[in-house]
Regions:
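Vicinal oxygen chelate
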Residues: 1, 3, 7, 11-13, 17-68, 88-93, ...
Length: 105
């Protein structure tokens, strides 16, 4: 994962990029930097995206409108909004076009 994409996801998820991360393998540590806590890893693959993501992340927020604005400031692109009687979400693309949803919590 290129460093800009690593920084994007670290900011979205409130995490830190591990110092030993590379452009091929990125580790996101908990926000407090505790290496013993749960980590998220991203591995770069050589193939370009040609179809729907193989993994789709849903980010849930109690402050949906504020989080939407924050994601847009980070560089996310709004793709579509979905509103129902009891649910609301927006599908975004990250800075490389990978899709994810923000769900009102």
């Amino acid at each position: 994962m290129p460093p800009p994409l690593a920084r994007f996801w670290a900011d979205v998820l409130g995490r830190q990029v591990a110092e030993d991360s590379t452009s091929e393998h990125v580790v996101l540590l908990p926000g407090d930097g505790d290496a013993s806590g749960p980590r998220i890893t991203f591995n770069k693959v050589p193939e370009p995206k040609t179809v729907k993501n193989r993994l789709h992340l849903d980010v849930v927020s109690d402050t949906f409108d504020a989080e939407t604005e924050r994601l847009l400031r980070l560089g996310a692109q709004r793709l579509r909004d979905v509103q129902g009687d009891k649910f609301r979400w927006t599908t975004f693309a990250d800075i490389e076009g990978n899709e994810f949803d923000l769900i009102a919590g």
